[in-house]
Amino acid sequence: MPASLAAVKHKIDSTKSTRQITSAMQMVSTAKLNQIQHHTQTYEVYAEKVKQMLSDLVKSHSATSAASQDDVYAALFKKRAVKKTGVLVITSDRGLVGSYNSNIIKQTLDMMAKHNLDKDNTVFLTVGKTGTEFFKKRGMNVVYEYSGVSDVPTYREVHSIVKTAVQMYSDQVFDEMYMVYSHYVNRITSNVIVHDVLPITEKSLLDDENEAQENTELNNSDVSTAHVSAEYEFEPSDTEIISALVAQYAESLIYGAILDAKTSEHSSSANAMRSATDNADDIISTLELQYNRARQAAITTEITEITGGMTAQE
């Protein structure tokens, strides 16, 4: 086999081996995506109930009367002068996820520019090695970092992230907090979201509830789904119930974002590996065509030489 043919054959074999790897990784990412989607849908039912109950309480006199007595309510609901801004950035630990990480980091930098934030008035809480390494290399103040989030994170697993973020806000390590993460839309699309989480505002809480109710009504247009605010009786007391519920709501936002981000990560990984597999198929087709043409040319040359030799003998 001529050297040129051997080189092309080697490229074909190498590309086929790479294709097998990317195809397998695509299937693994797709399986992880299916698994976490089921988990996320189950959690969203709980999170929506917490939000709905808190929204009802905010609109009721009970929350107003309890607010002056409740340290947690005051800490998480009441705005204060902003000296430091906390930014919770959720990225992946590894690569091979397409533009997933770069989009999140770009959106974070854009958000900082929009709100006039710099390393002197901003602290970072980072989930994922990519974000941690990026901001540390640029001299940013990373006050909390976490890596190794599992493929389907449970609340118990990421409990320290959630609790630390809320506690740091309560301890005035920062006076407001944003979350930046990739929101899963569908298997093709993900959008980076910048969400102002703390302090919790009544407007955002009620807007979220109205949006959720509108979506429910659209999905169930043939059924009356209007939400009726409930009358609550408190045991042991309204102050204790509201205190627990406000903290749960803040924590549910953060945990929900981690689940959403992980879902988007698996989707991005599956898409990146599918794209790599498709590209490998294109390369293999091109190389095989090149190989066949070169082989045909070599055969034609050999036949011509043999024919020429026989003619010369005659």
Swiss-Prot record:
It comes from Limosilactobacillus reuteri (strain DSM 20016). One of its GO terms (molecular function) is ATP binding. One of its GO terms (biological process) is proton motive force-driven plasma membrane ATP synthesis. SUPFAM superfamilies: ATP synthase (F1-ATPase), gamma subunit (SSF52943). It comes from the Bacteria. Its main location: membrane. Keywords: ATP synthesis, Cell membrane, CF(1), Hydrogen ion transport, Ion transport, Membrane, Transport. The lineage of its organism: Bacteria, Bacillati, Bacillota, Bacilli, Lactobacillales. Gene3D superfamilies: 3.40.1380.10, ATP synthase, gamma subunit, helix hairpin domain (1.10.287.80). It is a peripheral membrane protein. The keyword Transferase does not apply. F-type ATPases have 2 components, CF(1) - the catalytic core - and CF(0) - the membrane proton channel. CF(1) has five subunits: alpha(3), beta(3), gamma(1), delta(1), epsilon(1). CF(0) has three main subunits: a, b and c. Produces ATP from ADP in the presence of a proton gradient across the membrane. The gamma chain is believed to be important in regulating ATPase activity and the flow of protons through the CF(0) complex. Belongs to the ATPase gamma chain family. GO terms for cellular component: plasma membrane; proton-transporting ATP synthase complex. It is found in: Cell membrane. This is ATP synthase gamma chain.
